[in-house]
Regions:
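Short beta-strand-to-loop acidic/aromatic patch adjacent to the donor-nucleotide binding site
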Residues: 79-90
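Short, well-formed alpha-helical segments that are part of the catalytic scaffolds
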Residues: 11-25
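A short, conserved alpha-helix in the catalytic core of glycosyltransferases
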Residues: 160-162, 168-218
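Short, flexible, basic/aromatic active-site loop/helix in glycosyltransferases
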Residues: 131-167
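Conserved donor NDP-sugar-binding/catalytic core segment of glycosyltransferases
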Residues: 90-126
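Glycine-rich, basic loop-to-helix element that forms the pyrophosphate-binding segment
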Residues: 58-77
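Active-site-adjacent helix/loop segment of glycosyltransferases
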Residues: 203, 207-278
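A conserved acidic beta->alpha catalytic loop
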Residues: 34-44
Protein backbone atom coordinates (compact mmCIF):
# COMPACT_ATOMS: atom_id res chain seq x y z
CA UNK A 1 0.00 0.00 0.00
CA UNK A 2 1.21 3.49 -0.89
CA UNK A 3 0.15 6.34 1.37
CA UNK A 4 1.01 10.04 1.38
CA UNK A 5 0.81 13.08 3.64
CA UNK A 6 0.81 16.84 3.34
CA UNK A 7 1.04 19.40 6.15
CA UNK A 8 -0.93 22.63 5.86
CA UNK A 9 -0.55 25.92 7.70
CA UNK A 10 -2.73 28.70 6.32
CA UNK A 11 -1.86 27.30 2.91
CA UNK A 12 -3.29 29.16 -0.12
CA UNK A 13 -6.27 27.46 -1.71
CA UNK A 14 -4.71 27.22 -5.18
CA UNK A 15 -1.69 25.34 -3.77
CA UNK A 16 -3.85 22.81 -1.98
CA UNK A 17 -6.05 22.27 -5.02
CA UNK A 18 -2.99 21.77 -7.25
CA UNK A 19 -1.28 19.17 -5.07
CA UNK A 20 -4.57 17.37 -4.38
CA UNK A 21 -5.19 17.00 -8.12
CA UNK A 22 -1.72 15.47 -8.52
CA UNK A 23 -2.42 13.01 -5.70
CA UNK A 24 -5.87 12.07 -7.02
CA UNK A 25 -4.46 11.55 -10.52
CA UNK A 26 -1.90 9.15 -9.01
CA UNK A 27 -4.29 6.22 -8.77
CA UNK A 28 -1.80 4.14 -6.77
CA UNK A 29 -1.99 6.37 -3.66
CA UNK A 30 -4.58 4.69 -1.46
CA UNK A 31 -4.70 7.14 1.44
CA UNK A 32 -3.73 10.78 1.84
CA UNK A 33 -3.28 12.17 5.34
CA UNK A 34 -3.90 15.91 5.45
CA UNK A 35 -2.43 17.28 8.67
CA UNK A 36 -3.77 20.79 9.10
CA UNK A 37 -1.79 22.89 11.58
CA UNK A 38 -3.72 26.07 10.78
CA UNK A 39 -5.38 27.97 13.66
CA UNK A 40 -8.82 27.04 12.30
CA UNK A 41 -10.08 23.88 10.62
CA UNK A 42 -11.33 25.52 7.43
CA UNK A 43 -9.73 22.77 5.34
CA UNK A 44 -11.84 20.06 7.01
CA UNK A 45 -14.18 20.39 4.03
CA UNK A 46 -11.66 18.71 1.72
CA UNK A 47 -12.23 15.39 3.47
CA UNK A 48 -15.52 15.27 1.58
CA UNK A 49 -13.84 15.60 -1.81
CA UNK A 50 -12.33 12.10 -1.84
CA UNK A 51 -12.63 8.85 0.09
CA UNK A 52 -8.84 8.54 0.28
CA UNK A 53 -8.42 11.68 2.44
CA UNK A 54 -7.86 11.37 6.17
CA UNK A 55 -8.07 14.87 7.64
CA UNK A 56 -6.51 15.74 11.02
CA UNK A 57 -6.73 19.21 12.56
CA UNK A 58 -3.60 19.35 14.65
CA UNK A 59 -1.75 21.61 17.04
CA UNK A 60 1.14 23.26 15.19
CA UNK A 61 3.82 20.85 16.35
CA UNK A 62 6.08 21.38 13.33
CA UNK A 63 6.69 19.83 9.93
CA UNK A 64 8.45 16.63 10.96
CA UNK A 65 6.21 15.92 13.95
CA UNK A 66 3.10 16.36 11.81
CA UNK A 67 4.35 13.96 9.14
CA UNK A 68 5.28 11.51 11.90
CA UNK A 69 1.66 11.61 13.03
CA UNK A 70 0.56 10.78 9.49
CA UNK A 71 3.13 7.99 9.09
CA UNK A 72 2.11 6.35 12.38
CA UNK A 73 -1.49 6.28 11.18
CA UNK A 74 -0.35 4.98 7.77
CA UNK A 75 1.72 2.21 9.35
CA UNK A 76 -1.26 1.12 11.45
CA UNK A 77 -3.26 0.77 8.24
CA UNK A 78 -0.60 -1.38 6.57
CA UNK A 79 1.32 1.12 4.44
CA UNK A 80 4.52 -0.22 2.86
CA UNK A 81 5.55 3.03 1.13
CA UNK A 82 4.84 6.60 2.19
CA UNK A 83 5.26 9.86 0.28
CA UNK A 84 5.94 13.07 2.20
CA UNK A 85 4.75 16.00 0.09
CA UNK A 86 5.10 19.75 0.26
CA UNK A 87 1.83 21.51 -0.57
CA UNK A 88 3.55 23.57 -3.31
CA UNK A 89 4.02 20.69 -5.75
CA UNK A 90 2.56 19.52 -9.04
CA UNK A 91 3.35 16.20 -10.69
CA UNK A 92 2.12 13.86 -13.41
CA UNK A 93 0.04 10.76 -12.76
CA UNK A 94 2.91 8.33 -13.47
CA UNK A 95 5.43 9.75 -10.98
CA UNK A 96 4.45 7.84 -7.84
CA UNK A 97 3.90 4.56 -9.73
CA UNK A 98 7.34 4.85 -11.38
CA UNK A 99 9.04 5.47 -8.02
CA UNK A 100 7.13 2.54 -6.52
CA UNK A 101 8.34 0.26 -9.34
CA UNK A 102 11.91 1.45 -8.75
CA UNK A 103 11.69 0.76 -5.01
CA UNK A 104 10.17 -2.67 -5.60
CA UNK A 105 13.09 -3.53 -7.90
CA UNK A 106 15.71 -2.17 -5.46
CA UNK A 107 15.05 -3.47 -1.96
CA UNK A 108 18.24 -1.83 -0.67
CA UNK A 109 16.80 1.67 -1.27
CA UNK A 110 15.08 3.27 1.72
CA UNK A 111 14.33 6.71 0.29
CA UNK A 112 14.09 8.06 -3.24
CA UNK A 113 13.60 11.56 -4.65
CA UNK A 114 12.66 12.36 -8.28
CA UNK A 115 14.09 15.23 -10.30
CA UNK A 116 12.74 18.54 -8.95
CA UNK A 117 12.19 21.45 -11.35
CA UNK A 118 10.84 24.98 -10.97
CA UNK A 119 7.82 26.43 -12.78
CA UNK A 120 9.94 27.06 -15.89
CA UNK A 121 11.16 23.46 -15.94
CA UNK A 122 14.69 24.32 -14.77
CA UNK A 123 16.41 21.80 -12.53
CA UNK A 124 16.60 22.65 -8.83
CA UNK A 125 19.89 21.44 -7.37
CA UNK A 126 18.47 19.56 -4.39
CA UNK A 127 20.94 16.67 -4.19
CA UNK A 128 23.47 17.72 -1.58
CA UNK A 129 26.29 16.69 0.66
CA UNK A 130 25.69 16.57 4.40
CA UNK A 131 26.17 20.25 5.34
CA UNK A 132 28.80 21.74 7.58
CA UNK A 133 28.30 25.09 9.35
CA UNK A 134 30.42 26.77 6.67
CA UNK A 135 28.09 25.50 3.93
CA UNK A 136 25.22 27.22 5.68
CA UNK A 137 27.16 30.48 6.11
CA UNK A 138 28.28 30.56 2.46
CA UNK A 139 24.77 29.85 1.21
CA UNK A 140 22.89 32.25 3.45
CA UNK A 141 25.05 35.25 4.13
CA UNK A 142 27.75 35.71 1.50
CA UNK A 143 27.30 37.14 -2.00
CA UNK A 144 26.77 34.62 -4.78
CA UNK A 145 30.21 35.37 -6.19
CA UNK A 146 31.75 34.09 -2.93
CA UNK A 147 29.44 31.08 -2.56
CA UNK A 148 29.59 29.86 -6.17
CA UNK A 149 32.45 27.40 -5.70
CA UNK A 150 31.03 26.14 -2.42
CA UNK A 151 27.59 25.56 -3.98
CA UNK A 152 29.17 23.82 -6.99
CA UNK A 153 30.44 21.10 -4.68
CA UNK A 154 27.82 21.14 -1.89
CA UNK A 155 24.84 20.98 -4.27
CA UNK A 156 26.64 18.48 -6.52
CA UNK A 157 26.32 20.84 -9.48
CA UNK A 158 29.29 19.13 -11.12
CA UNK A 159 27.25 15.91 -11.37
CA UNK A 160 24.88 14.92 -14.16
CA UNK A 161 21.36 15.61 -12.86
CA UNK A 162 19.97 13.41 -15.64
CA UNK A 163 21.56 10.35 -14.05
CA UNK A 164 20.70 8.36 -10.94
CA UNK A 165 22.82 9.20 -7.87
CA UNK A 166 23.24 7.92 -4.34
CA UNK A 167 23.09 11.05 -2.16
CA UNK A 168 23.25 11.52 1.65
CA UNK A 169 20.95 14.58 1.71
CA UNK A 170 17.79 14.76 -0.39
CA UNK A 171 15.30 17.61 -0.26
CA UNK A 172 12.22 17.29 1.93
CA UNK A 173 9.82 18.69 -0.67
CA UNK A 174 9.11 15.20 -2.07
CA UNK A 175 10.30 12.20 -0.06
CA UNK A 176 9.30 8.68 -1.15
CA UNK A 177 10.03 6.41 1.81
CA UNK A 178 10.09 2.68 2.33
CA UNK A 179 8.01 2.46 5.51
CA UNK A 180 10.36 -0.16 6.94
CA UNK A 181 13.23 2.34 6.68
CA UNK A 182 11.24 5.13 8.34
CA UNK A 183 10.31 2.83 11.22
CA UNK A 184 13.91 1.68 11.62
CA UNK A 185 15.10 5.26 12.22
CA UNK A 186 11.93 6.20 14.17
CA UNK A 187 10.78 8.86 11.72
CA UNK A 188 11.61 12.55 11.77
CA UNK A 189 13.43 14.02 14.76
CA UNK A 190 10.74 16.15 16.37
CA UNK A 191 13.25 18.48 18.00
CA UNK A 192 13.39 20.28 14.65
CA UNK A 193 10.29 22.39 14.12
CA UNK A 194 11.14 22.73 10.42
CA UNK A 195 13.99 22.94 7.86
CA UNK A 196 16.78 20.52 8.91
CA UNK A 197 14.44 17.54 9.36
CA UNK A 198 15.13 16.40 5.77
CA UNK A 199 18.91 16.52 6.27
CA UNK A 200 18.59 14.59 9.51
CA UNK A 201 16.28 11.81 8.32
CA UNK A 202 18.10 11.29 5.01
CA UNK A 203 21.46 10.78 6.71
CA UNK A 204 19.94 8.43 9.30
CA UNK A 205 18.32 6.31 6.58
CA UNK A 206 21.52 6.54 4.47
CA UNK A 207 23.32 4.70 7.27
CA UNK A 208 21.24 1.55 6.65
CA UNK A 209 19.85 1.90 3.11
CA UNK A 210 20.62 3.62 -0.15
CA UNK A 211 19.11 7.10 -0.50
CA UNK A 212 18.69 7.75 -4.19
CA UNK A 213 18.02 10.56 -6.65
CA UNK A 214 16.01 9.10 -9.54
CA UNK A 215 15.58 11.54 -12.45
CA UNK A 216 13.46 9.46 -14.83
CA UNK A 217 10.42 11.29 -13.49
CA UNK A 218 10.13 14.87 -12.27
CA UNK A 219 8.07 17.05 -9.96
CA UNK A 220 7.32 20.77 -10.24
CA UNK A 221 8.30 22.68 -7.08
CA UNK A 222 6.33 25.86 -7.55
CA UNK A 223 7.52 28.22 -4.83
CA UNK A 224 10.87 29.41 -3.44
CA UNK A 225 12.06 28.73 0.09
CA UNK A 226 10.21 31.01 2.48
CA UNK A 227 13.23 31.65 4.68
CA UNK A 228 14.87 33.57 1.81
CA UNK A 229 12.05 36.12 1.87
CA UNK A 230 10.91 36.27 5.50
CA UNK A 231 13.02 37.46 8.44
CA UNK A 232 10.78 35.50 10.80
CA UNK A 233 11.29 32.24 8.91
CA UNK A 234 15.02 32.91 8.54
CA UNK A 235 15.16 33.11 12.34
CA UNK A 236 13.28 29.81 12.64
CA UNK A 237 15.66 28.28 10.10
CA UNK A 238 18.75 29.41 11.98
CA UNK A 239 17.40 28.29 15.38
CA UNK A 240 16.71 24.82 14.04
CA UNK A 241 20.07 24.57 12.27
CA UNK A 242 21.75 25.35 15.59
CA UNK A 243 19.82 22.43 17.10
CA UNK A 244 20.94 20.27 14.17
CA UNK A 245 24.64 21.04 14.62
CA UNK A 246 24.33 20.65 18.39
CA UNK A 247 23.05 17.14 17.69
CA UNK A 248 25.55 16.05 15.04
CA UNK A 249 28.59 18.23 15.74
CA UNK A 250 29.76 21.62 14.56
CA UNK A 251 33.35 20.77 13.66
CA UNK A 252 33.76 17.07 14.36
CA UNK A 253 31.18 14.93 12.58
CA UNK A 254 32.88 11.73 11.42
CA UNK A 255 29.75 10.40 9.73
CA UNK A 256 29.36 13.59 7.69
CA UNK A 257 32.98 13.29 6.60
CA UNK A 258 32.53 9.63 5.65
CA UNK A 259 29.26 10.08 3.74
CA UNK A 260 30.53 13.11 1.81
CA UNK A 261 33.82 11.42 0.93
CA UNK A 262 32.01 8.33 -0.37
CA UNK A 263 29.57 10.45 -2.38
CA UNK A 264 32.26 12.56 -4.04
CA UNK A 265 34.29 9.46 -4.88
CA UNK A 266 31.29 7.73 -6.49
CA UNK A 267 30.60 10.84 -8.55
CA UNK A 268 34.28 11.15 -9.54
CA UNK A 269 34.48 14.72 -8.26
CA UNK A 270 38.29 14.95 -8.25
CA UNK A 271 38.66 14.03 -11.92
CA UNK A 272 35.77 16.26 -12.97
CA UNK A 273 37.33 19.13 -11.04
CA UNK A 274 40.69 18.55 -12.73
CA UNK A 275 38.95 18.50 -16.08
CA UNK A 276 37.47 21.91 -15.34
CA UNK A 277 33.82 20.92 -15.56
CA UNK A 278 31.83 23.69 -13.89
Amino acid sequence: MITASIVLYNTPKFQVETVLKSVFDSKCIEKLYVIDNSPNDWWRCIAKTSSIIRYVHNENTGYGASHNLAMRKAAEEGSTYHVVLNPDLKFDSNVVQTLYDFMEAHKDVGHVMPKIVNQEGEVQYLCKLVPSPSDLIFKRFLPKSFSKNSAYKFQLKFADYDKEMDVPYLSGCFMFFRMEAVQKVKGFDERFFMYPEDIDITRRIHKFYRTVYYPKVFVYHLHAAESYHSKKMLKVHMQNMIKYFNKWGWIFDSERKQFNKETLEKLDYKNLKKGGRK
